[in-house]
Amino acid sequence: MISVNDFRTGLTIEVDGDIWRVIEFQHVKPGKGAAFVRSKLRNLRTGAIQEKTFRAGEKVSKAQIDNRKMQYLYANGDQHVFMDMESYEQIELPAKQIEHELKFLKENMEVFIMMYQGETIGVELPNTVELKVVETEPGIKGDTASGGSKPATLETGLVVQVPFFVNEGDVLIINTTDGTYVSRA
């Protein structure tokens, strides 16, 4: 059991018979009344996001998640195939279950597959990934310090806002948590 006062982003908990990952949380101490913790949770089975409020000091169960290192192989229709790096066992995950992660997955990329009591519940990406720009407007010559941005389409289909100096063919480092540009690789 873990106290809601000890919540941190990325923590995996068990609430109402489901497995949730803490996305955001905020400790609130109103002037009148008891303190509470407002949290935003992602259901690891369905991908649904729910806001939940807990009383300060309330206890919840910490879910024991096993991470298996796997390699993303390919998409097979609506299924995505991953291979265990040690046993060469292959598993398939439906696109609906890993919708957010698909924007960052490239073939042969190594990721962690999250397992809960023998059930595959999702993909854990690295904090950042390197993706190639396949389409963007050409930069304006000499415009390096204006601080503006333009949209760029990456090799996975993800569209991110990038600085004007980024060109087609550049490899960028992208934050997988919020899908934002970090830097050039």
From Swiss-Prot:
GO MF annotations, alphabetized: translation elongation factor activity
Entry's Gene Ontology cellular component terms: cytoplasm
Keywords in alphabetical order: Cytoplasm, Elongation factor, Protein biosynthesis
InterPro entries (UniProt xref): Elong-fact-P_C, NA-bd_OB-fold, Rib_uL2_dom2, Transl_elong_fac_P/YeiP, Transl_elong_KOW-like, Transl_elong_P/YeiP_cen, Transl_elong_P/YeiP_CS, Transl_elongation_fac_P
Pathway noted in the entry: Protein biosynthesis; polypeptide chain elongation
Entry's localization field: Cytoplasm
Keyword Ligase recorded: no
Protein name in the entry: Elongation factor P
